Each structure stands twice: as structure tokens, then as C-alpha cells.
Amino acid sequence: MAELMLLSEIADPTRFFTDNLLSPEDWDSTLYSGLDEVAEEQAQLFRCVEQDVPFDSSSLDVGMDVSPPEPPWDPLPIFPDLQVKSEPSSPCSSSSLSSESSHLSTEPPSQVPGVGEVLHVKMESLAPPLCLLGDDPASPFETVQITVGSASDDLSDIQTKLEPASPSSSVHSEASLLSADSPSQPFIGEEVLEVKTESPSPPGCLLWDVPASSLGAVQISMGPSPDSSSGKAPATRKPPLQPKPVVLTTVPVPPRAGPTSAAVLLQPLVQQPAVSPVVLIQGAIRVQPEGPAPAAPRPERKSIVPAPMPGNSCPPEVDAKLLKRQQRMIKNRESACQSRRKKKEYLQGLEARLQAVLADNQQLRRENAALRRRLEALLAENSGLKLGSGNRKVVCIMVFLLFIAFNFGPVSISEPPPAPMSPRMSREEPRPQRHLLGFSEPGPAHGMEPLREAAQSPGEQQPSSAGRPSFRNLTAFPGGAKELLLRDLDQLFLSSDCRHFNRTESLRLADELSGWVQRHQRGRRKIPHRAQERQKSQLRKKSPPVKPVPTQPPGPPERDPVGQLQLYRHPGRSQPEFLDAIDRREDTFYVVSFRRDHLLLPAISHNKTSRPKMSLVMPAMAPNETVSGRGPPGDYEEMMQIECEVMDTRVIHIKTSTVPPSLRKQPSPSPGNTTGGPLPGSAASPAHQASQPLYLNHP
């Protein structure tokens, strides 16, 4: 059974969209399952309805000029004098055809179509009862053959032959028309027509599946008279056709048990009871004479569609399942169309957003490139400005360093040139140099010689008695002055351990100590001269004693038990040995004393986070000099107080032979010496005792 489709749902244009193009996978495989058997017939019928072309053009002769097709239900103007009326009989009985044939044969000659008349062929079939929807039962097709012959005496017989239709469901009709221009020169012609007959649908039917009925081939042959078989030359004009009386012979055709075809008739034709159906002939007719007649065009097959007849069958009831299934299919198609439309709109929206984002990205990239270029320009300008300021800073720093180097460096312009050194000293490694601050009690003149020689020729070597080189103090005296000066005060405070002190304060302290040492040296040089002058004045005042004359001659002089020969000792030999014994350092002030009359005071408290402190209080000026100006020298004592931090304490051993003779002389002890050590000699004056230093330190 063919699938059922409602015309109202198919014809509604609002239920489908232009983009509703389903692929073969979207359709159900069973949609056309019922149409497999009648695919060929259905295609033929639907093609004729849609294209409005009733006949197949493939069967036409391409050598002929074919006129454009016309509607199949319009009368053809080719043969206006020919009207075929056919009444096919039922396949069950042939009585109707026999009666019709007898009726046609008994008609008077006046009713036989002649020249200018129309031949009527009537084909009737039982009309089915009226129905709304359903199937039309199969009705057999037959082949009708009509032979019309013209003669001078009587009418030609018209034979009707029914033959089974071909499987292609097409009715072929061949008509042979034999005519002559005159009774003596008849015109012979032959026409082959293709006739397609359909049973009309009853009025009131909307849509149904009509089974393919058995179509027949109608062949109409019009032959010449027997006396015209000799074949004379055709005349110049076409004679009118005078057919013989029609004799119909029917041949029953059994019904065909083949596949049925479905036909859809949108507008049925109403059958008039008084008017017989008209056979429609469309297309050119080729007429070919027989015998020696001139050549004529080849016959052409044309399709004849008879008027539809009412049917006798009623379609069964509509299947509800198929209807629901068809509705579901339509809904599925609609939903698929909507989903595709939504997907398309979504993709279009995504494309629009993508284009907008790409445009924004390009704009941001351009802005980023512009900002980078501006940043590079600003960085280049900033680097140029920094480079200029850096150059100025470098120049200022270099000028400051040069100023320091020329004023306080080793090549300072204010520093005197160093004393020349002997080649032997230049070859040897430099040893640490030290400044010695000391004093000695007044004694013979030879006690001051070592200091004077050291002051006059500093840095020179003096060979000892054993042949070893002896080293002197390398402290230089500028301008040959006989006072102890520092070589360079700036170099004494440039060491790493003194950088945390105030430089100005350090220089001030160094100047104070240097002045104190110089005043002490000048005082030691003045005291011996005054003592010698006093002794000379006392000797002048005393008269020499009178010696008595001995009674006996003097004998040989007595010798000292010490020895006959006294070796000469260089007065400055012990000075370098003494400096080496105390391990003198050039950046340190030394106070050396061999007397034990100093006062020692211990510290009451001590800070464990700092070094022990020590204060030295010693005479600052000579006995007859004053600095403060507070009064006569006898009222006040000028003392120098030195604040120190104890760095280290140790015990050293000095040979007695290395001690200078001026410091080695020990006076007789006095009862007031509580320390038990040697005290200064009694020959020393009180002023000289007052000039001795006083050591104050904690134990």
C-alpha cells in the first residue's frame, strides 16, 4: 500500500523553510517502501501532472518538426474532422462490445462519417461509487484496433481488437488512413497514434491512490479500396476522406495481474450523459502513401488521453497509525529545520563576535606598539640625561680625590723631601721605625753626645766594636734642628685601626704631644751647661792649697787595678741597642723611666665593654718656663696629662749594657723612698727633680 500524505499539510507553505534540505539519512527508510512496486507508473503519472506534458518525447522522431506541447485536455486542431468514440467492454464479458459492433454495423450510411465528419470511438467503463479517500480497484487495459477502409462502392470495415497492454502502462494506437484525391486516383495515407486512456475519478474525491488499470492500445487503420491497389500517381490536392462502414470486432483481454500504479487527480472531469468521450490527438501526423505513391513522412506515435470515467471502487478507511507516523515525520522535519536555523544563527553570532574580538585585538596591538615606541624614546632620553649628570659627578669626584692626593698623600706638596739613605740601607728591607720620648738626669757632657749625634745624623749606621751594623732612629729633624719632630703626622693616623676617630682631634693631640716632647728636649740641653758654669765659678773662688815639699823623692806612680789600657767606647753605641730592645714603633710615643719615684693610682671601677684607660701626668714645661701665666713658677707646676687606652701589657728584658749611661747612674737611696727602688742623685737640684715625669697608671 502506498504511503498516505495529506494535501493540506503538503501545500501549506508556512510549515517549511527555504533551508529545509534534508539529506537521505534524515528520511525514514520505510517512507518509500510501499512505492517500490509502482515506482515506474507513479513517476509517469506525476510527471504528466507536474510538467503538464501528457506524452513522452523520447518516442518522437527527431527528424520531424515537433510543435510545442499543449494541455492534454484541449482539443487538437490537427484533425478537426476526426472524433473517435470508443466503448471498451468489461474483461468479464464481451457482450457489450458485440452489441456495440452490431449497433455500429446497422447504422444507416447517412450516419457514417464522411468528408468533414468526425469518427466517434466510445470507450466506457464502470464508474466506481463516490468516496472520499481510498484505492481504486484495478481495471484492465486493452488494445483497441480500428481499421477504416475507403471504397467507391461500400464502406470499409472498422475492426476493433483488444490486446493486453504492455507493462509500461502506455496505450499505443496506430491509425492508418487511406484516402485518394479522386475516385480514379485515391490518396493513401497511414497514421500511427499513441493513445493513453485513463479512468476518470469520481466527483468528490480529494486524494487517493488509484491502482494502475489495464490500458489498451488503440490502433486505427484506414486502408484504401481494393481497386486502388494498383497505385496511381497522387493528385495535386488532398481528397476528402470517405470511410467505409465501421465493423468492430472485440477480442477479450484478461485482467493483468501486474503491479498497480497510483494516479493523483486534483480536479476530476464530469461525465456528461449525452456526450461521448472525445479522443484527444496531439502532435503532427505523418501520412505515407502505399505503393508507387510519392514518399511521405514517417508515421509518428502520439498519445491519446480519453476522457475519464467514474470509477466503481471505494478506498478503504484511512490507517490512523500511518497518519500519526506521517505527522511525526513532519514534526521531526520542522524541528530539524528549526535546529538547523538556530545552529546557523548561533554560528553567525559567533562569527560576528570573533570578527569584533579580532578587530579589538588588532587595535590593542597597534596601541601597544605605539606605547612601546614612546617608552623606548623616554628611556633613551632618560639614559642621555643620566649620562650627562654622571659625567659631572665623576668630574667632581676626580677633582676632590686629586686635591686630597696633593695635600695629604705621599706626594704631598707640603711634605719635606725624605733624608737620603745609604746604598746599604736601600738594599735592605725597611724595618719598622719608632719615635722615642725619654729623658736622662744631668751628668757629664759625654752623656748627651749620643742624643746629639742621633739628632745631627739620623738614619745613619754606626759600626759597633764587634763589627755588627747598628741602627739609629730614622726620625728626621728639618733644617738640622736639634729637636725631635714627627716625620709626617698625617701618616700616623691613616691606618685602618684609627679611621673611626675624628681626624681633626687626632691631629690636635699629635701636635700637643710633639710640642711637649720638643720642650722636654730643649730643657735637657740647657741644664748641663748651667751646671758646668756653676762648677767653674766655684773653683775660681777657692784658692789652690799649698803642697808641702816631701823629704824623700817621689817614687813611681801607682797604677789602677783596673788595667793598664782603657778601651775607647763610642758614646752612641748603646742608643740603637736600647731602641731595639724596647721594640720601638714609629707611630707610638714612648715615655721611658728608670726611676721608681712615680705614683701609681688604681682604677675604682672598670667597664667590661671597653678597654682599660690610663692617664699619664708628667711635667709639661721646664722649671723656669711657664705657659699659663698664672703667676711665678714657684706657685704652680705645669703638668701634661695624657689619656690613653691600654692595648697590651707585657714584660721585657733589657740588658744593662744597652741602657744609656745617663740613665744608668743610680744615686744613694733615701729614707723616704717607699718603693725600694733607686731615687735620683742628691747632687740634682730641686728644679731638676721637679722636671722629672710622673707616671700614673692602674695596675
UniProtKB/Swiss-Prot annotation:
Glycosylation site residues: 473, 502, 607, 624, 673
Q: Name one GO biological process term.
A: mitotic chromosome condensation
Domain bZIP, by residue range, is 322-385
* Gene3D superfamilies per UniProt: 1.20.5.170
Q: GO cellular-component terms in the record?
A: condensed nuclear chromosome; early endosome; endomembrane system; endoplasmic reticulum membrane; microtubule organizing center; nuclear matrix; nucleus
**Residue ranges of region Leucine-zipper?**
347-354
Query: What is this protein called in UniProt?
Result: Cyclic AMP-dependent transcription factor ATF-6 beta
Task: Give the organism the record lists.
Answer: Mus musculus (Mouse)
